[in-house]
Structures are given as C-alpha cells and as structure tokens.
Amino acid sequence: MSSSSAHQKASPPIEEEATEHGPFPIEQLQASGIAALDVKKLKDAGLCTVESVAYSPRKDLLQIKGISEAKVDKIIEAASKLVPLGFTSASQLHAQRLEIIQLTTGSRELDQILDGGIETGSITEMYGEFRSGKTQLCHTLCVTCQLPLDQGGGEGKALYIDAEGTFRPQRILQIADRFGLNGADVLENVAYARAYNTDHQSRLLLEAASMMVETRFALMVVDSATALYRTDFSGRGELSARQMHLAKFLRSLQKLADEFGVAVVITNQVVAQVDGAAMFAGPQIKPIGGNIMAHASTTRLFLRKGRGEERICKVISSPCLAEAEARFQISSEGVTDVKD
C-alpha cells in the first residue's frame, strides 16, 4: 500500500476520553468525603473506578494496606450511593439491553447466528482445536471493533493479551485494508501485552482497568485464557489451586465487562476425552477449565475445521441465542463469508 493511498484511508472514530455515561473514576469518591490518600491507596490496589469498589467483596477491601475497617465501611457506603446495586424493573433492564452493541465478526452468516455479532458487556468463549480459526477471529475483531457503530463496530480500541505468542500485526494491517481503515491508526489503537505466566496474566488485568478509565475500549481479547494454566499447574494435586486461580481471573474479566461495557473474548484450548465410547465413535474433545470456565462464559462457541479454509462455528450455550451453526472462511482479509 503506497503512502498516498494510506492517507486516503479513514481513521477509526475512537473517542480519546471515556464518555460521560461510562464508569465513575475512583477520584469521584473524594466528593463523597473519602480522603485523597485513601483514594490513592484504592487506586494503587488496582481499583480505578467507583464501580470496581462497589463490586468488590468487603474482605478484599480490608486486605488493602493502610485502610482500616471503619474506613472500608465508609468507602462501601460512598460507593453504593454512586453505583446502584439494588433491584430494578425488568422493563428498565430490557431498555438497557436494547442499547447493547454487537461487534461484527466480518462474516454476515456468522453475525446472523450471533444476533448481530459479538456482544459487548459480556464474556464470549471460543474453543476448538488447533487451526480452527480462533486467533484469526480475534484479529478480525481487533479491527471491526474500531469501525463506526453503523458499520457493526464499537468505535473503541482493542486490548489483546497474548499467552501463546500468536498475535501478528501484519494480519491487522491486511484486515484494516479490507475495511478501508488507515492501518497505522488501527495498529495504534490495539494495546498488546504478552503474558508469561498465570500471575502475570492476572496482573495485566489491573493495568487494563487503568487504561480503560483513560480512553474508550470496545474489545478485550485473551488468547488463550487457559494455555498458561496447563503449564503452571500440573497433576491432580494442583487441580484445586488451578481452578481457584482460574475462577478469580475469569471473575476479574467479568468485572471489566460490567464496569466498562467491553466485549470480552477469550479463546480456550481443548483436550481429547478418551473413554469406553471413544473406542467406537472416536475420542470426543472437550474445552479446558471444566465447569468454572463453562459458568463464566456468557456465550460459548465451538469452532471446527471444514474443507480447505472453511470453518464452522456452533453456538453451544447462550442465554439468548438459539443453538445454530454458521460457516465462515479464513482469508488474507480475516474472517469472511464462504465463497461458494
């Protein structure tokens, strides 16, 4: 692509500051009588919004160094006045859900079974074997989330945690070109971090929260959410510790989705389940993480290979989507419809 054509590409419509309808910055607690020093202690502990304080268990707040039990009660009271945590009517909830944005996947057929695309404000899990299209779909979403709302985008940046070293900026440039976006701007709007162990992966979420306070993000990707758990925890002896660590990580992801309204997309590896039935039907594959992963995901998608570059996505579980399948294709332009 020549430099002259690059200048003709549209820049993604990203808002540099959080919208007025976004979460309350943690500094808002000062207006409710919380001392600036205590607010700083909350922020240093990774609590960057009033919502994050309101959603935290009291025992977690008590663990913050330098904040007494009396101060914790005062902080909780102040946060609860700013963030409504009580009952609301189903009609109000319905009105709120009508405003939820879906991010296009790049394939109309896939968008159709997802009721418009990947839902913001919730966790979507994609699992499947190697080369089933999980990472390619994540790359495509990093571009489409930056599109205008009327084009199926979220007008926000993307945040990508890479646990397997499979993120490729060149793919982002190719996909941006397909959508007529300036490649350099699109890359600038993707915040990337490589995760090296499960503790590091969790710490990156604290950094992500502070970034989301500063500017609008529409998408957060963790590829893969379980890869490091398979290496950091081994054997049945560490299974309980692994599941507890994974549950806390997934809960932190859900809090980010709740606080900032981002679409959280996590990929998951699979393992072959070999039992007596497998002798006749072949080994069945199941996603890693067990019930903890299954319950944490709002929408669960199973991706598998088709013929050539064709892939098949099946909705496994969702509170609002019917069980259905869609075909899509992986090309140099990312995820597209199958060309028959």
Swiss-Prot record:
Q: Which GO terms describe its cellular component?
A: condensed nuclear chromosome
Organism from which the protein derives: Zea mays (Maize)
- Keywords linked to the UniProt accession: ATP-binding, DNA damage, DNA recombination, DNA repair, DNA-binding, Nucleotide-binding, Nucleus
For this protein, the record's Gene3D superfamilies field holds: 5' to 3' exonuclease, C-terminal subdomain (1.10.150.20), P-loop containing nucleotide triphosphate hydrolases (3.40.50.300)
Gene Ontology annotations of biological process type: chromosome organization involved in meiotic cell cycle; DNA recombinase assembly; DNA strand invasion; mitotic recombination; mitotic recombination-dependent replication fork processing; reciprocal meiotic recombination
Family, similarity comment:
Belongs to the RecA family. RAD51 subfamily.
Describe the location of the HhH domain by residue ranges. 49-78
Please indicate if the UniProt record lists Cell membrane as a keyword. Answer: no
Q: Which domain of life is it from?
A: Eukaryota
Q: Which cysteines are joined by disulfide bonds?
A: none
- What is its quaternary makeup? Self-associates and may interact with XRCC3 homolog.
Task: Check the record and name the InterPro entries matching this protein.
Answer: AAA+_ATPase, DNA_recomb/repair_Rad51, DNA_recomb/repair_Rad51_C, DNA_recomb/repair_RecA-like, DNA_repair_Rad51/TF_NusA_a-hlx, P-loop_NTPase, RecA_ATP-bd, RecA_monomer-monomer_interface
- The UniProt annotation puts the region (Disordered) at 1-22
Report the locations given in the UniProt record: Nucleus
Instruction: Tell me the Pfam families matching this sequence.
Output: HHH_5, Rad51
Entry binding sites for ATP: G128, E129, F130, R131, S132, G133, K134, T135
Record bears the keyword Transferase: no
- Tissue specificity field: Highly expressed in mitotic and meiotic tissues, but low levels in differentiated tissues.
Q: What is this protein called?
A: DNA repair protein RAD51 homolog B
